[in-house]
């Protein structure tokens, strides 16, 4: 109360001290005095001109904001680099999918930066990140930053159209993604860079100079990132934040937010939220660690994620924080609350933690205001950090400061203020929140204020506290917060207007708080005239009865909004009202609308347009529990919730789904997942899913039974202990437990003991150079002790034949044999009862592992290595249920499982499983063949959806081929897809094959058939443990159903596992592949992001290859209909089952291969089908000869001794040879993720700059020595390694230098740069010693390989030349495939056609027709290289082929290889005195050796500069030109018709025999095509070979000099005739025949 004493001109302020502080009272009094004086001095001034700021306020503000905010003028990457230098080995990232140290993160981000710089990324160029939460997010952000670009992380939960709008707004054409999200990324950008997956930390480091991106001009005012917020115009706004802004904010936040160097900051926030940037980038400049949970853990089990990652610091919105109990976060020290206003109850809930309140709008960096949470006032925000200053101004006029304590608009000053909105045309307008000019009051209060200071009007209403702290008081506009996300109602309204305007519907948006959750309510009205009226003058607001027309409009609007806006911005309900009220100011009267909505029952809000259906009332316990949970979370009466009630149509959203999950354990429903709620939103469906888990628990497997007491699963424990001690040869005290084997294990042991399967499957892991081997062993020991399955052995009871598992103590079994390597399949341990089932060896950096098939399935072995990788990095080994829990569950549920399978198969047709038709046991062989196709698929909600489509497609094939509607085939069940959480976490062989019965009902629609299949499979998943053998014992029909001939396997395309401690891709043993030999036909579908590889694995002795090809073609055809967009309109009967690809076949070959020898048969190594009209049945037979010896350490090539191709080779033989070598190369290829990591080290210039070491073969030959010369003389190449045949290094070097001197270029100055390795191309590992081979294969020593070496011999057989010419090429190609950043150039020979347009099969026919083994070896060697290049992804084209014609000497020296065919032919004609005039108009490709060698080296250094896989060396001459050049040299020759010339050649050959120049090629004389005398043959050379006129002139000069050289050395006769002895002195190159 203010008391004025007019006589004394004194005013007294009376106040309640319990509500107003003395400081507040003083400021009120000072303000009153200032206002009163102002009015008294000028009573006629306008109200807005009255001064309200007192001197007390001015003095206090001067004190608080005396200094300008501190700006850090530094780029982010410089601060990060400092941290890397200080603590390179400290953990930078700990994530669900792996971890990185600071050094490793620096390394990988630098590789990515180099790649981005090559793509043109630089300052202020934006790159988007399209990836779900994983450890590669920091790599992507840092890589972009180091390239001097700016990033924007996309929230993939948002609609694709909104993501496209963001990319368009940023003008971003490049996105970085992971394999999981690459399909989405390709829809957003023209250039996609894929990183991540299971790719490892690369230990093989490149040179430090190459490890960092090239320096470019970076500046602190360059853009760092952009984050998008809601915009009132209908489009999101992109805030552009600069380096100096974020760095200033982050460094100033570290101390106030209590971030310590050893903290682990939880990366929780969505990428649409600017806090997500803070969570990633701030830890990396403070020395802390980013803790990244999986998206699944983040939504479903945040408590477990925090515990597993050891997070100590987290930032959550209050809405999320109140879902959890703080006691469930023991590792958490600090909790920051932000994004929305915290309630005092939130602060009280988390008072056991250090709770910090944070604030800042996205336009001012993530955080700039913070303070310890105030339990008494949830509006408390904290104080400004040193990077910014806070001012309170008049909401209507920012040029007017308000008194301390007054509520006004919060204005932020400092470097933290963003540059602007991306491409904002209104940036400089007065309405822009970014203030362009410094306010006068700031200059008055602070004399040193710079003119360039940045200010931002937040739109938030706030007030000062007495200590400069800030209190949030609301918004001055209609902007709202939904789940912490800023939302402009205007954006929603704008989009709704554009959708509904054609329907003449008005729209308005309000937000209601309903039971602690913000809901957007949309009002629509047909009476758009109401918008123009005054709400005070129109009638009562009321809900209009819904019409079909309005409902359709709303449904359409909702659908469109979901495509263009995030789900949280789509209205929860639409209310159709009689009109939209407006206020006196002409704006929508939202206050009245809000009051009207709040007056309605909540059920009414949800029922009006949602068509709420309740259905039957719940009956089961699970149904009643879910009804109660729905009611509690959604605030709806239970009697309004029935079996048909849909969680989301009742008003639920993603946040309330998390609340539902948090409530589930209290209701005893612990096995419902976040995805389950979205997948089964109807109460009845979610209850059914929950009941499956409950059934499992009742049967003895769940949380209450996760611990089984030792020996409790056997009856006579003591006698079994004695038996086990004897069979295992161990002490009784070392036996920890004994329990029965599962039916699956018993079956595996039975087959293993009988020798029908390989019992132990083995693999090897090469340790990284920096890895501590003791630490690796210690980690394995810890895993061995923690995982009882690894310590399990198997014994057999002699009396009953029962198999038991014995868990023993002790340490892991290490094989101490230093010589043998048991990790090879052929030398693996035999199946032994009582022996160790896991064996390991660690020798010379190689960890070899052998594990029995009875102990694992595919999931288990991958998870084991993931767990060990985490433990190696310091994470605790996960606690998993023991396998005896599963054994107990399987034993207790035998009755229920038997009942299920009896009911399922009791009336099955006795012939339902007989496709393909069974064969007798005697005729069954173990000869496996493979065929493969690739089909385009789009992975839908989950792989289960696709699996149902595959199963229906296969059922339709069986029906079409047997005409039986009752179909049974086998399916491989993981045992985990629909299991409880405990089952999913168990290590052990849970996966098994069970029969699936499908009844074809033609009247059923495809959608219904798929839904039924999926339901059947989910129900069946609970009982797969019974096993095929026991199911078959349930009756005659069940036994017949278990005689399955076909098994269908559907599994994801998982990348090769790679770890932080081992360097090579681990091709893990695959259980499903191993089981394929037990069935006549296995169809394996490997599902990728946008395609599926479908393999048929079959017994080719009894199932013809052509029939399997037809089956695959038919499968593709049927699947295309079921998977297609029109499938929902199809009935099962309308599916076309005809194999349409046969319709266009003019005739079908009846010739079938008589044998398919123990091989791997692929239709094509790229998994694409051959032409359906192929008419080469012999090719099928020849291709079946492919045998591939699989070694997990190195893809090798082996041939059955009985499989040597007959000579001369046919075209089918050549194709078979190509397939064999190509398969070896294909298996050497690493995973797509590791390909990417290698690619990151490459740029378009990386092969033309920097340090290079080049490896050259054939360096002592005619062409090879010139290649060596250009390598040694090229300044870009620092080191050259030449492989030369020789018994010692000295001999090899001597041969190399001798060749160089013969070519007239050697100088001793070349010695320092040259290293010569003795070897032999015909030998394994090229005949190199172990050290040299390791250097060649280590991925770091060699940057490029030039493979020129070959054995050139016209008389030897193919088999004699194969090892040198083909085998060596295959070995080098495997190295190149395994290391995609290795440049590989193969020097090949030319054929008539354009080499890049040449088709393989016609070429094979042509090459076979020549009957020349040398040419055939070159063709076979070249073809796998061509196929490999075709398989490589875009940008991975480091493999090139140089295709040569005839090579002559250079223009200066003319030194040639005198044994080349061209010179022998010319010598023959000179000697005869005549030449073939019939070939004069024909053209031959010819090049000089210098130009040729130079082109080869240039290609090796810069393969990207050669756009096609094959580079032909252009240039050539007409034969008439050649003869003119020869005669111009003084050689007298007469032109003769072909027949006369041939007669002369035959006569001379007969007379001179071995002294004749063509004697060694006499078998080719009759082949006119080889002598180029076939009319028209020469003209068949494609234009790709022909050079320009300058090339031709240079070529003529080189040709003359070569002829002169041959005359000088005596190969061609001189002026007095040719040397009679035919000897050529040592100046020319020769071949040994």
Swiss-Prot record:
The modification O-(pantetheine 4'-phosphoryl)serine is found at residue 654. The keyword Cytoplasm does not apply. One of its GO terms (cellular component) is cytoplasm. Keywords: Ligase, Phosphopantetheine, Phosphoprotein, Transferase. InterPro entries: ACP-like_sf, AMP-bd_C_sf, AMP-dep_synth/lig_dom, ANL_N_sf, CAT-like_dom_sf, Condensatn, Far_NAD-bd, NAD(P)-bd_dom_sf. Residues 80-483 are annotated as: Adenylation (A) domain. Pathway: Alkaloid biosynthesis; ergot alkaloid biosynthesis. PROSITE patterns: CARRIER, PHOSPHOPANTETHEINE. One of its GO terms (molecular function) is phosphopantetheine binding. It comes from the Eukaryota. GO terms for biological process: amino acid activation for nonribosomal peptide biosynthetic process; indole alkaloid biosynthetic process. CDD domains: A_NRPS_SidN3_like (cd05918). NRP synthetases are composed of discrete domains (adenylation (A), thiolation (T) or peptidyl carrier protein (PCP) and condensation (C) domains) which when grouped together are referred to as a single module. Each module is responsible for the recognition (via the A domain) and incorporation of a single amino acid into the growing peptide product. Thus, an NRP synthetase is generally composed of one or more modules and can terminate in a thioesterase domain (TE) or reductase domain (R) that releases the newly synthesized peptide from the enzyme. D-lysergyl-peptide-synthetase subunit 3; part of the gene cluster that mediates the biosynthesis of fungal ergot alkaloid. DmaW catalyzes the first step of ergot alkaloid biosynthesis by condensing dimethylallyl diphosphate (DMAP) and tryptophan to form 4-dimethylallyl-L-tryptophan. The second step is catalyzed by the methyltransferase easF that methylates 4-dimethylallyl-L-tryptophan in the presence of S-adenosyl-L-methionine, resulting in the formation of 4-dimethylallyl-L-abrine. Belongs to the NRP synthetase family. This is D-lysergyl-peptide-synthetase subunit 3.
């Amino acid at each position: 109360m203010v008391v004025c004493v007019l006589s004394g001109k004194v005013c007294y302020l009376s106040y309640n001290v319990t509500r107003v502080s003395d400081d507040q009272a003083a400021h009120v009094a000072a303000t009153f005095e200032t206002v009163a004086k102002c009015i008294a001095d000028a009573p006629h001034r306008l109200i807005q001109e009255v001064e309200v700021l007192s001197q007390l306020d001015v003095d206090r503000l001067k004190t608080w904001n005396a200094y300008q905010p501190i700006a850090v003028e530094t780029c982010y990457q410089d601060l990060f680099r400092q941290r890397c230098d200080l603590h390179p080995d400290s953990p930078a990232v700990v994530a669900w999918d792996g971890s990185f140290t600071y050094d490793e993160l620096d390394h990988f981000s630098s590789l990515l930066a180099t790649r981005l710089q090559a793509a043109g990324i630089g300052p202020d160029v934006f790159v988007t990140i399209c990836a779900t939460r994983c450890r590669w997010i920091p790599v992507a952000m840092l890589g972009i930053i180091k390239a001097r670009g700016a990033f924007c992380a996309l929230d993939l939960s948002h609609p694709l159209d909104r993501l496209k709008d963001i990319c368009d707004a940023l003008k971003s054409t490049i996105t970085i993604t992971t394999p999981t999200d690459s399909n989405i990324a390709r829809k957003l950008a023209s250039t996609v860079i894929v990183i991540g997956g299971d790719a490892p930390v690369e230990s093989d480091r490149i040179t430090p100079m190459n490890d960092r991106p090239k320096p470019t001009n970076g500046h602190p005012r360059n853009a760092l990132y952009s984050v998008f917020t809601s915009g009132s115009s209908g489009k999101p706004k992109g805030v552009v934040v600069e380096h100096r802004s974020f760095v200033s904010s982050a460094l100033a936040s570290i101390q106030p937010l209590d971030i310590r160097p050893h903290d682990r900051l939880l990366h929780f926030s969505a990428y649409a939220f600017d806090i997500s940037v803070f969570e990633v980038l701030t830890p990396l400049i403070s020395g802390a660690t980013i803790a990244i949970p999986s998206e699944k853990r983040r939504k479903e089990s945040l408590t477990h994620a925090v515990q597993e990652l050891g997070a100590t610091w987290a930032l959550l919105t209050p809405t999320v924080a109140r879902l959890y109990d703080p006691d469930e976060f023991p590792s958490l020290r600090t909790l920051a609350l932000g994004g929305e206003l915290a309630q005092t109850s939130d602060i009280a809930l988390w008072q056991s933690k250090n709770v910090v309140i944070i604030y800042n709008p996205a336009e001012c960096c993530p955080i700039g205001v913070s303070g310890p949470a105030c339990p008494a006032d949830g509006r408390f925000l904290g104080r400004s950090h040193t990077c910014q200053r806070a001012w309170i101004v008049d909401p209507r006029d920012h040029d007017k400061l308000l008194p301390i304590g007054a509520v006004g608009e919060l204005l932020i000053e400092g470097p933290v203020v963003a540059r602007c909105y991306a491409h904002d045309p209104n940036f400089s307008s007065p309405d822009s929140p970014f203030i362009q000019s410094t306010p006068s009051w700031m200059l008055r209060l602070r004399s040193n204020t710079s003119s360039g200071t940045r200010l931002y009007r937040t739109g938030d209403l706030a007030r000062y506290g007495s200590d400069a702290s800030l209190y949030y008081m609301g918004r001055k506009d209609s902007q709202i917060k939904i789940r912490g996300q800023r939302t402009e109602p205007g954006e929603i309204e704008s989009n709704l207007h554009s959708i509904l305007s054609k329907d003449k519907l008005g729209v308005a948006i309000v937000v209601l708080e309903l039971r602690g959750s913000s809901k957007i309510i949309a009002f629509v009205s047909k009476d758009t005239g109401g918008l123009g009226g005054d709400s005070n003058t129109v009638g009562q607001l009321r809900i209009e009865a819904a019409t079909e027309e309005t409902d359709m409009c709303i449904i359409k609007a909702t659908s469109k909004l979901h495509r263009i806006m995030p789900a949280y911005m789509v209205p929860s309900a639409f209310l159709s009202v009689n009109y939209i009220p407006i206020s006196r100011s002409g704006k929508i009267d939202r206050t009245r609308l809000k009051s009207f909505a709040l007056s309605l029952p909540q059920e009414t809000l949800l029922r009006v347009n949602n068509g709420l259906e309740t259905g039957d009332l719940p009956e089961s316990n699970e149904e009643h529990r879910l009804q109660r949970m729905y009611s509690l979370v959604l605030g709806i009466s239970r009697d309004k919730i029935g079996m048909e009630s849909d969680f989301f149509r009742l008003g639920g959203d993603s946040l309330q789904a998390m609340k539902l999950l948090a409530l589930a354990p209290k209701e005893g429903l612990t096995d419902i997942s976040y995805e389950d709620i979205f997948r089964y939103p109807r109460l009845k469906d979610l209850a059914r899913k929950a009941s499956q888990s409950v059934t499992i628990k009742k049967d003895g497997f769940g949380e209450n039974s996760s611990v089984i007491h030792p020996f409790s699963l056997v009856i006579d424990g003591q006698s079994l202990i004695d038996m086990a001690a004897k069979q295992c040869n161990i002490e009784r005290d070392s036996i920890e437990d004994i329990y029965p084997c599962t039916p699956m294990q018993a079956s595996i042991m039975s087959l293993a003991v009988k020798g029908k399967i390989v019992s132990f499957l083995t693999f090897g892991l090469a340790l990284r150079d920096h890895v501590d081997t003791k630490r690796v062993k210690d980690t394995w020991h810890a895993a061995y002790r923690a995982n009882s399955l690894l310590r399990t052995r198997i014994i057999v009871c002699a009396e009953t034949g029962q198999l038991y598992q014995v868990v023993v103590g002790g340490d892991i079994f290490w094989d101490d044999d230093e010589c043998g390597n048991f990790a090879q399949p052929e030398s693996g341990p035999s199946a032994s009862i009582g022996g160790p089932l896991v064996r390991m060896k660690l020798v010379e950096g190689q960890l070899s592992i052998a594990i029995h098939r009875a102990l694992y399935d595919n999931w288990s072995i991958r998870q084991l290595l993931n767990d060990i990788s985490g433990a190696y990095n310091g994470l605790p080994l996960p606690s998993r249920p023991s396998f005896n829990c599963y054994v107990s569950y399987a034993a207790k549920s035998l009755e229920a499982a038997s009942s299920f399978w009896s009911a399922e198969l009791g009336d099955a047709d006795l012939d339902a499983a007989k496709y393909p038709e069974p064969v007798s046991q005697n005729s069954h062989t173990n000869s496996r063949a493979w065929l493969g196709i690739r089909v385009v698929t789009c992975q839908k909600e989950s792989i289960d959806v696709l699996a149902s489509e595959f199963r229906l497609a296969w059922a339709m094939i069986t029906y079409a081929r047997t005409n039986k509607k009752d179909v049974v085939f086998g399916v491989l069940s993981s045992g985990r897809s629909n299991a409880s959480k405990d089952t999913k976490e168990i290590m052990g062989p849970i996966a098994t094959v069970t029969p699936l019965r499908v009844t074809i009902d033609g009247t059923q629609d495809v959608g219904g058939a798929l839904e039924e299949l999926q339901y059947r499979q989910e129900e069946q998943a609970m009982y797969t443990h019974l096993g095929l053998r026991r199911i078959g014992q349930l009756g005659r029909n069940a036994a017949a159903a278990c005689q399955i001939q076909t098994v269908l396997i559907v599994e994801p395309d998982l990348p090769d596992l790679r770890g932080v401690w081992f360097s090579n891709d681990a091709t893990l043993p695959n259980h499903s592949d191993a089981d394929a030999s037990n069935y006549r036909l296995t169809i394996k579908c490997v599902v990728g992001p946008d395609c599926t590889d479908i393999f048929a694995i079959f017994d080719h002795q009894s199932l013809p290859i052509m029939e399997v090809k037809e089956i695959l073609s038919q499968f593709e055809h049927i699947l295309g209909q079921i998977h297609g967009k029109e499938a929902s309109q199809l009935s099962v009967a309308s599916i076309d089952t005809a194999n349409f690809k046969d319709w266009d076949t003019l005739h079908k070959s009846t010739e079938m291969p008589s044998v398919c020898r123990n091989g791997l048969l692929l239709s094509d190594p790229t998994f694409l089908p051959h032409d359906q009209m192929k008419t080469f049945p012999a090719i099928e037979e020849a291709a079946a000869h492919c045998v591939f010896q699989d070694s997990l350490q190195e893809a090798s090539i082996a041939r059955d001794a009985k499989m040597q191709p007959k000579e001369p080779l046919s075209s089918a033989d050549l194709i078979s040879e190509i397939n064999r070598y190509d398969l070896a190369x294909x298996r050497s290829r690493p995973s797509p993720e590791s390909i990417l990591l290698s690619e990151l080290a490459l740029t378009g210039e990386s092969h033309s700059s920097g340090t290079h070491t080049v490896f050259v073969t054939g360096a002592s030959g005619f062409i090879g020595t010139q290649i060596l010369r250009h390598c040694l003389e090229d300044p870009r190449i620092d080191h050259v390694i030449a492989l030369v045949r020789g018994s010692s290094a000295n001999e090899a070097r001597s041969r190399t230098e001798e060749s160089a001197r013969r070519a007239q270029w050697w100088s001793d100055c070349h010695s320092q740069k040259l290293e010569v390795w003795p070897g032999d191309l015909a030998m394994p590992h090229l005949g190199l010693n172990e050290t040299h081979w390791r250097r060649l294969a280590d991925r770091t020593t060699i940057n490029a390989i030039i493979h020129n070496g070959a054995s050139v011999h016209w008389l030897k057989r193919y088999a004699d030349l194969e090892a040198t010419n083909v085998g060596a090429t295959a070995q080098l190609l495997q190295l190149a495939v395994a290391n995609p950043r290795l440049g590989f150039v193969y020097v090949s020979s030319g054929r008539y056609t354009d080499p890049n347009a040449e088709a393989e099969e016609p070429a094979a026919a042509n090459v076979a027709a020549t009957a020349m083994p040398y040419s055939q070896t070159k063709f076979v060697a070249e073809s796998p290289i061509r196929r490999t290049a075709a398989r490589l992804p875009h940008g991975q084209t480091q493999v090139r082929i140089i295709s040569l014609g005839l090579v002559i000497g250079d223009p200066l020296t003319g030194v040639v290889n005198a044994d080349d065919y061209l010179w022998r032919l010319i010598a023959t004609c000179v000697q005869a005195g005549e030449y073939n005039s019939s070939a004069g108009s024909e053209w031959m490709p010819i090049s000089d050796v210098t130009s040729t060698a130079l082109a080869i080296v240039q290609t090796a250094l810069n393969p990207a500069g050669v756009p096609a896989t094959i580079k032909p060396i252009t240039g050539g001459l007409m034969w008439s030109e050649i003869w003119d050049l020869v005669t111009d040299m003084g050689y007298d020759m007469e032109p003769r018709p072909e027949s006369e010339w041939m007669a002369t050649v035959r006569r001379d050959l007969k007379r001179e025999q071995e002294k004749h120049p063509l004697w060694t090629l006499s078998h080719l004389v009759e082949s006119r095509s080889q002598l180029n005398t076939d009319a028209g043959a020469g003209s068949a050379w494609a234009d790709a070979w022909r050079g320009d006129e300058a090339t031709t002139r240079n070529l003529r000069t080189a040709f003359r000099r070569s002829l002169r050289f041959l005359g000088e050395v005596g190969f061609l006769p001189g002026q007095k005739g040719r040397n009679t002895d035919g000897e050529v002195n040592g100046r020319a190159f020769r071949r040994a025949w």
